[in-house]
């Protein structure tokens, strides 16, 4: 009916220019340019295993993105709150781009969340197996929480209800709906910092660029799952896996380009 959903696209210092250029070259894929805003994710220093900060050049510290939990803070820093307020936005749908079947601004998901009275919602799928590498939506101390697969014990992962279903059986697909008002209330709250071992390019003492083949230090990230835990409640909204979950984590094999292509074809997409 002539209405458009504003899109806020988070980029990095590395890919920002290329991303904007890509949209411009494709004329924003027919979407009104005024409804598309780009912003750069904030960065934090990376260090070695002893806590020494790596250098990217003689004058620049090696930096890394601050994790997917930094999206709202990065929007605020980019001055986009004024745009959000001017448009009268009450809900923000945040999602990961490595799932090519994400259904965004889903009216049923939005409606279910609003009708529930909850201040957030999370799309979930039934886990394909107890050891599937997805975080699961649960409650912790009376508040919504997401337990990452690597944090779960074997006993937790395989626990079942009386009807045989997995006790922790609903995996998140990184598609969340948040009350904009609540996001502003928690904007200044301190989020947990997750220390992640990664491969960090840097220069050595002689000024040579080093691109390690093994993890050589730590990056420091905030995660969107911690934002869910900061909500008073969160409605789990189950979707059909084959219609909305095609993660791309690998080139081939499980959760790969190959499996994503087949799932897209199954949804009627011509490649």
PLM regions with names:
Residues 84-93, 101-105, 110-270:
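Catalytic core of tubulin tyrosine ligase-like
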């Amino acid at each position: 009916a002539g209405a458009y959903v504003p899109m806020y696209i988070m980029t990095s210092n590395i890919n920002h220019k290329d991303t904007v250029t890509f949209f411009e070259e494709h004329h924003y894929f027919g979407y009104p340019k005024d409804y598309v805003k780009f912003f750069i994710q904030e960065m934090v220093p990376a260090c070695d295993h002893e806590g020494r900060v790596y250098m990217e050049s003689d004058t620049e510290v090696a930096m890394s993105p601050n994790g997917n939990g930094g999206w709202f803070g990065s929007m605020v820093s980019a001055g986009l709150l004024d745009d959000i307020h001017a448009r009268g936005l009450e809900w923000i749908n945040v999602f990961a781009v490595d799932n090519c079947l994400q259904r965004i601004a889903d009216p049923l998901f939005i409606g279910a969340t609003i009708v529930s009275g909850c201040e957030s919602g999370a799309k979930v799928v039934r886990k394909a197996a107890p050891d599937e590498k997805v975080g699961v939506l649960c409650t912790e101390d009376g508040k919504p929480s997401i337990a990452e697969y690597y944090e779960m014990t074997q006993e937790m992962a395989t626990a079942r209800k009386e009807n045989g279903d997995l006790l922790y059986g609903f995996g998140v697909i990184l598609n969340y709906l948040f009350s904009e008002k609540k996001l502003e209330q928690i904007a200044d709250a301190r989020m947990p910092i997750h220390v992640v071992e990664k491969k960090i390019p840097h220069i050595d003492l002689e000024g040579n660029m080093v691109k390690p083949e093994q993890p050589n230090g730590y990056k420091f990230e905030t995660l969107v799952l911690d934002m869910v835990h900061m909500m008073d409640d969160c409605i789990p909204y189950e979707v059909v896996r084959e219609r909305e979950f095609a993660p791309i984590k690998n080139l081939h094999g499980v959760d790969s380009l190959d499996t994503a292509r087949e799932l897209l074809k199954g949804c009627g997409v011509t490649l």
